[in-house]
């Protein structure tokens, strides 16, 4: 009969502590890139939708991650990460 392996990995941080630390890091990064009033409105929407629950914490983490990813991908002026617009040359053969 199979047995579950013993827990041999390193001690893990409890999920709720990890989630709150992640949320704090995301909030600190978000205020550098988005208007505070806009972020406050987002927080109010999450609170009105989920209340003071872990589901709300997970939702705002997910939304902030997506917003920051898209913001950096489009090309944040404060970051070296992102798409750099290039001029296309019309004289060469087209790629298809």
Swiss-Prot record:
InterPro entries for this protein: RetroV_VpR/X
Q: According to the lineage, what is the superkingdom?
A: Viruses
**Where found?**
Virion; Host nucleus; Host extracellular space
Residue numbers spanned by region Homooligomerization? 1-42
Q: List, in alphabetical order, the GO biological process terms annotated in this UniProt record.
A: DNA-templated transcription; monoatomic ion transmembrane transport; protein homooligomerization; regulation of DNA-templated transcription; symbiont entry into host cell; symbiont-mediated activation of host apoptosis; symbiont-mediated arrest of host cell cycle during G2/M transition; viral penetration into host nucleus
| Keywords attached to this entry | Activator, AIDS, Apoptosis, Cell cycle, Host G2/M cell cycle arrest by virus, Host nucleus, Host-virus interaction, Ion channel, Ion transport, Modulation of host cell cycle by virus, Phosphoprotein, Transcription, Transcription regulation, Transport, Viral penetration into host nucleus, Virion, Virus entry into host cell
| Gene3D superfamilies xref list | 6.10.210.10, VpR/VpX protein, C-terminal domain
> Which residue positions does Phosphoserine occur at?
79, 96
Q: Name the predominant localization.
A: virion
Post-translational changes noted in the entry: Phosphorylated on several residues by host. These phosphorylations regulate VPR activity for the nuclear import of the HIV-1 pre-integration complex.
Q: Which GO terms describe its cellular component?
A: host cell; host cell nucleus; host extracellular space; virion component
Q: What else is known?
A: HIV-1 lineages are divided in three main groups, M (for Major), O (for Outlier), and N (for New, or Non-M, Non-O). The vast majority of strains found worldwide belong to the group M. Group O seems to be endemic to and largely confined to Cameroon and neighboring countries in West Central Africa, where these viruses represent a small minority of HIV-1 strains. The group N is represented by a limited number of isolates from Cameroonian persons. The group M is further subdivided in 9 clades or subtypes (A to D, F to H, J and K).
Subunit structure as annotated in this protein's UniProt entry: Homooligomer, may form homodimer. Interacts with p6-gag region of the Pr55 Gag precursor protein through a (Leu-X-X)4 motif near the C-terminus of the P6gag protein. Interacts with host UNG. May interact with host RAD23A/HHR23A. Interacts with host VPRBP/DCAF1, leading to hijack the CUL4A-RBX1-DDB1-DCAF1/VPRBP complex, mediating ubiquitination of host proteins such as TERT and ZGPAT and arrest of the cell cycle in G2 phase.
The Swiss-Prot or TrEMBL record describes its family as follows:
Belongs to the HIV-1 VPR protein family.
Please name the HAMAP family in this protein's record: HIV_VPR
Q: What does this protein do?
A: During virus replication, may deplete host UNG protein, and incude G2-M cell cycle arrest. Acts by targeting specific host proteins for degradation by the 26S proteasome, through association with the cellular CUL4A-DDB1 E3 ligase complex by direct interaction with host VPRPB/DCAF-1. Cell cycle arrest reportedly occurs within hours of infection and is not blocked by antiviral agents, suggesting that it is initiated by the VPR carried into the virion. Additionally, VPR induces apoptosis in a cell cycle dependent manner suggesting that these two effects are mechanistically linked. During virus entry, plays a role in the transport of the viral pre-integration (PIC) complex to the host nucleus. This function is crucial for viral infection of non-dividing macrophages. May act directly at the nuclear pore complex, by binding nucleoporins phenylalanine-glycine (FG)-repeat regions.
Q: What is this protein called?
A: Protein Vpr
